[in-house]
Design a protein with these regions (language model features):
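ALDH superfamily catalytic-core signature
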Residues: 7-112, 164
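Active-site phosphate-binding strand-loop segment of PLP-dependent enzymes
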Residues: 1-2
Length: 200
């Protein structure tokens, strides 16, 4: 646990297995079947409850068919909490407060009142591909009422913690009954996810 450069050096030079707690580039994916009110409440909590923790959502992925019904109220709520919102070009006309996102934003753990939003045009498979490419393997959530989409997401996102209709900030050892956590392992090898004394 620590800064990226420290962790990468330890991993590179270590002669033994290292349990690493890397960046928390967490995603919340809003599927077109999701309930707008739930999406607003969960998404705002996932970012703004504590913006500086590793379980905070850094990128919202939203189905193109959910933009009109879901996104305006989410943007309004985030604006009220002084969150800077960076979006792809197609969304800029939704609100004058929005800023243009760069490709670097998809790789960024802000740890601040900043969030990026990307439109998903080809459904859950595209969302999973984005997460597995840009994410850090920490925590990712899907907001959906579609069982097939949920099952696909939970089975294919390659992260230590995957969630359904839940804030990514729920990712904590205490919440899972592990007691106080040492960190959240983003390793492929076990232990993976929240690591408490028992897992160590």
């Amino acid at each position: 646990r620590g800064g990226r450069s420290l962790i990468e050096r330890v991993i590179k030079e270590s002669k033994v297995h290292v349990i690493r707690h890397l960046d928390g580039i967490c995603h919340t994916y809003i599927h077109k079947s999701s309930k707008p009110k739930l999406c607003k409440e969960v998404t705002v909590n996932a970012k703004m409850r504590r913006p500086g923790i590793c379980g905070a959502t850094e990128t919202i992925l939203i189905d193109k068919d959910a933009i009109k019904s879901h996104l305006p109220t989410i943007i309004e709520s985030l604006n009220q909490l002084n969150c800077e919102i960076r979006v792809e070009k197609s969304l800029l006309n939704l609100n004058s407060s929005l800023k243009l996102a760069s490709n670097e934003d998809w790789f960024t753990e802000y740890l601040d009142k900043i969030i990026s939003i990307k439109v998903i045009t080809n459904g859950v498979q595209e969302a999973v591909e984005h997460i597995n490419f840009y994410g850090s393997g920490h925590t990712d959530a899907i907001l959906s009422e579609d069982k097939k989409a949920v099952d696909y997401f939970l089975n294919n996102v390659d992260s230590g913690i995957v969630m359904h209709n839940t804030s990514t900030q729920f990712a904590d050892g205490g919440e899972f009954g592990f007691g106080g956590e040492v960190g959240i392992s983003t390793n492929k090898l076990p232990p993976r996810g929240p690591v408490g004394l028992k897992q160590l």
